[in-house]
C-alpha cells in the first residue's frame, strides 16, 4: 500500500494546486483551459475525499488504541472498543474503494455506443436470435434510463435481423456494454423444428464507442461516396430520388451503406457517424497498447469471432465463457435483466487490474 499512498499524496497535492489555479484570473479568462482544469479537478475529487476520510479513520484508530492502552473503566472501554471496531471496518472498506478509484480509467467509459448485431451461423434461426439480442439490449437500456436509435436494419422474411445497427445514448453506456462484443451462441428448439431437436446458432455483436469529438480525422480523399435509390422488400424502389448512400473508406476497405433515413443528407450523416466509429474501432484493434494488453488478460481477447456467451433455452441457463459464470435465469436476462452478468464482468476486470496495480 505504500506506493499507493505515495500516489494518493501526489493526487492530493495536484488537487490543491488545481484549486489555486482555478482562482487565478488569467485561468478564469481562458475558457478552454478553465474547462480542462475544472474537469481534471472534478475527476480527482472523489479520490481525494476518500483519501482524506481514510486519514481521519486511521488517526481515530490510533487515538482509540492509545486510549485503551492508558486504561479505562469498563463502560468507557466498551464504548471505545466498539468505536475502534467500526473504524477498522471502515478503514478496510475505504482501502478497497480507493484501490478501485486508482485503477486506470478507460477513456471511452463515458461515451455512448454504436452497436451492430448480425445473425451468423444458423440461417433463419440466427436472424431470430439476433432480434432477441436486440430486444434484450433494448430492455436493458430502458432499465438504465438510456435511449436507443435504430440507424440501420435488414429484416429477414421470418421477422429476424440479418443485421441491425443502433446508437445507445445515456450515462456511461460504454462502461457497461463494452464487454458485449463477440459471438453469442444460442441452443434451443427452433419454432420450425417439427422433431423437437435442439439446434445451435450464433449471432455476433460489435460494440464501438460513438465518436462525437472524433479523435480520428478522415481525409475526404480517402472516402468514396456512392448514391443510389433506396429499395424495399424484394429490391423494389421505394422512392424516385437517390437518397441511399454508400461510403467506402479506401485505406481499410470498410463499407457503410445507409438507406433508412428520409433524405440523402440524413443518410450521409448517419453513414459518416458509423464509418468514423468503424474506422476508429479498426485502428484501435490494431494497436498493441498497454490498455489492450490489460483487456486481453481480463475479459477475453476482444476478437470479434470469440465465443463469449451461450444461451441455453432448455436449461434456462446463460453461461459467460470468459469468466466461467453460469446463471439459471435466461428468461429474466433476455428480458433485459443483464445487471448480474455485467456486474460480474466489471468486477472480474477490476480484480485483475487491481492485482496488476498492487504488483507494480
From Swiss-Prot:
Keyword Amino-acid biosynthesis among record annotations: no
N5-methylglutamine: residues carrying this PTM: 236
Organism: Ligilactobacillus salivarius (strain UCC118) (Lactobacillus salivarius)
Record keywords, A-Z: Cytoplasm, Methylation, Protein biosynthesis
Major place of residence: cytoplasm
Subcellular location: Cytoplasm
GO molecular function terms listed in the Swiss-Prot or TrEMBL record: translation release factor activity, codon specific
Name of the protein described by the UniProt record: Peptide chain release factor 1
Encoding gene (name): prfA
Post-translational modification: Methylated by PrmC. Methylation increases the termination efficiency of RF1.
Gene3D superfamilies (alphabetical): 3.30.160.20, 3.30.70.1660, 6.10.140.1950
Assigned protein family: Belongs to the prokaryotic/mitochondrial release factor family.
Keyword Cytoplasm included in the entry's annotation: yes
Its job: Peptide chain release factor 1 directs the termination of translation in response to the peptide chain termination codons UAG and UAA.
